[in-house]
């Protein structure tokens, strides 16, 4: 099995502006890898190139230059996308269908029939917590419920890779938490998740690695614990320690009955890293 789920090499996308001599560079010389089985967050402000990058990976937009691969296959090939699920930022739903009918419709598009399809529908409705709402029309669903049925729709073909473009956009905190738990569950099942998000605290909770885009450029990329670590600072967590002991740190701790619970790198937050990264990039 290929250990790299998604590979992006030298990716550039330029959009011409009609009736103008200018053009918009949406993505600039982008290189990144998404490991199989990990949750990778592509972060950035509006217009940074996140959605364009995802659409190129999915074969929905052609790159100006560069290439993308899904599990070692060129993503332009239809076969490379047979085991890929996608939830766009603003998915379109047939509001007159019920939740069950929606999954049945997309399941048939993916070639499922009979009892395997019915079993898959039941599994997914249970996974996203919509079993009790399966016979309701989508027109009666809340935004959070629509996102969950959209995620179930993206999973109908039992994908190895799921691409989520702003999966919690417009969802209230409770619904956002449910989506977060579903993404964690996908990771537990060994499914690779590539997502874009503007909810940095949530991304910090669920992503193994992140890449931060600004003006189409990857300005930060790596594992979260490394990115948010503050160099030359260490936190000591002590039990039963007096304020004096805290000030004197380890030497006095060893001479006392205080117990050193943990020692770790001090960290910033993903939100602070994001703001610093995007503020400093002037391209």
Name each region found by the language model.
Residues 3-6, 13-195, 200-214, 219-220:
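ABC transporter nucleotide-binding domains
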């Amino acid at each position: 099995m290929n250990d790299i789920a998604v590979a992006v090499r030298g990716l550039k996308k330029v959009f011409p502006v009609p009736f103008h001599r200018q053009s918009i560079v949406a993505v600039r010389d982008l290189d990144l890898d998404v490991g199989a089985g990990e949750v990778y967050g592509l972060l950035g402000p509006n217009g940074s190139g996140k959605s364009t990058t995802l659409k190129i990976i999915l074969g929905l937009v052609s790159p100006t230059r560069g290439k993308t691969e899904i599990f070692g296959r060129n993503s332009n090939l239809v076969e490379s996308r047979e085991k890929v699920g996608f939830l766009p930022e603003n998915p379109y739903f047939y509001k007159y269908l019920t939740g069950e009918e929606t999954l049945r419709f997309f399941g048939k598009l993916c070639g499922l029939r009979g009892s395997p399809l019915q079993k898959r529908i039941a599994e997914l409705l249970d996974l996203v917590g919509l079993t009790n709402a399966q016979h309701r029309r989508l027109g009666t669903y809340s935004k959070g419920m629509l996102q969950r049925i959209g995620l179930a729709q993206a999973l109908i073909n039992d994908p190895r890779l799921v691409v989520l473009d702003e999966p919690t956009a417009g969802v209230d905190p409770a619904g956002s938490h449910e989506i977060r738990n579903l993404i964690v569950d996908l990771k537990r099942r060994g499914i690779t998740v590539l997502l874009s998000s503007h909810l940095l605290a949530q991304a910090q909770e669920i992503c193994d690695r992140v890449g931060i885009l600004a003006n189409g450029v990857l300005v930060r990329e790596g594992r979260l614990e490394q990115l948010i670590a503050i160099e030359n600072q260490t936190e000591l967590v002590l039990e039963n320690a007096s304020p004096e002991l805290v000030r004197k740190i380890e030497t006095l701790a060893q001479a006392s009955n205080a117990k050193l619970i943990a020692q770790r790198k001090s960290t910033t937050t993903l939100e602070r890293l994001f703001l610093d990264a995007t503020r400093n990039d002037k391209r």
